[in-house]
Structures are given as C-alpha cells and as structure tokens.
Amino acid sequence: TSQLKKEFELEDALNNIGKDITLSCCVHKIRTMGKISFVVVRTGRYTLQTVYSEDNCKDSIKWLKEGFFVNITGTVTENEKGINGIEIILKEIKLISAVGYEYPLHVSNKKLGCTLDVNLNNRSVSLRNPYERAIFKLQEGVCNGFREFMLKENFTEIHSPKIVAQGAEGGANIFHLD
C-alpha cells in the first residue's frame, strides 16, 4: 500500500539544516549565472530557493522549465539571502510532470501584467503567482480570526443556503423551448 506524504512545512527544512531532504514541488523560476543556477520552487504554501551546480547534482537541468513538477533532494543550508533564510543545494532532481503547453502568462513575474480576461480564463495558472494568491491568504486570515473570536464568545457557526435572483445551479426550468 502507498502512504500519503504529508505536505511540506517550512519547519521541516529549518529543523534539518545540514541534512538532506526530499520534497515534491513546482519549478517557479530558473536563473542561471555562469556555472550555477538558482531554481526557485513552490510547495503548497512556501517558496524555496535551490542551488544547482554540476559539481553537486548528478542530474542535468537543461530540460527543466517553469511549471514542471519535480521531486528534489538536497542539503538544507542557512543563507540569509535565500528565501526564508535557507537554500537547498540540489543533489538530485526528477521529473514528476511536464507542462504540456506554454503558459499564457508568467507566474514568476512579481505582477502578472495581463488583462482581466486572460487572468480569469487561466485562473488555475494565475493563482500560482504569489501576488495573485495573497488576496486569498488575507481573506483566509480575516475569516479565521473572525471565526475564532466568535467561537470564543460561544456563537454557533451556521452555513445557510444562499438566496440568489437566478437559479444558482441551473436546471431544466431556466431553458426555454420554442
């Protein structure tokens, strides 16, 4: 039987400085500077910087592109210039899933800089951008804070049906036949 992996937490890396860790992640950005490359990766909630050099990693990264999902293994090192104060020195990188098409927008840019139509038509991709995702993190924090306060005051949380002007789910009665 296969075991479900727990989601990566930043503490997993911070508690393993000098040790090797393996994690599944998405390639966010690749910056090559001479013989080394900085591969910024995203996990469910975190962005981490990895450092690739041919001396340390047995795998080439010439095939690697933004959006690819990979398993990486590397040594966690402290570096105040690294994202979250750490870097992972890559030892191994294996492809899980490649992107089948060119993204219509670049999620590694600070701001997407695209029209609202392009953003909404590609929402599953645009939400990979930290700036686009921040509004939902803010909303999550406000809702959790409000919920915790109300529960401490002995209120009951109720999930009521929503009343809307039109049929929310649709149905045969919305379609007219001539």
Give names to the regions the model predicted.
Residues T1-D178:
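Class II aminoacyl-tRNA synthetase catalytic cores and aaRS-like
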